[in-house]
């Protein structure tokens, strides 16, 4: 079982429900992250401003990596508090977070993906990109 954990209350609730209802013994806790340099380049490219090519020397120096590591550790702590053995995975997102989660699920050969959702409906859901929705549509695996 792969738990897509981003540190939100929704992700924590999804982990708690999965522990109660699916009763796994071991879970793969996955936190997907995007380097700050890539986030900045994507944001700046929309404005037409010249993009800098400066990037940190190593992953460990990237503040986004440090934050993702902290979040993943919180997921492991939550899993252990629920009586589960958790294995931590950090995945750098090259395209979208949903693609990173799906690729990791296939690589880890899990049988189900657990993810939280914002449960948007109506007009807001139509205009808002949903990671959970993309996972459901493209994973080829059960999603809880």
How would you describe each model-predicted region?
Residues 1-58, 82-87:
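Small/aliphatic-rich secondary-structure junction motif
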Residues 8, 35, 106, 118-121:
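Short glycine-rich anion-binding loops that position phosphate/pyrophosphate groups of nucleotides
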Residues 61, 65-76:
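Short, surface-exposed alpha-helical segments at coil->helix boundaries
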Residues 70, 77-113:
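Structural beta-alpha unit
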Residues 112-138:
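Glycine-rich, Arg-bearing micro-motifs that act as flexible, cationic patches
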Residues 138-144:
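Short, flexible loop segments at boundaries between secondary-structure elements
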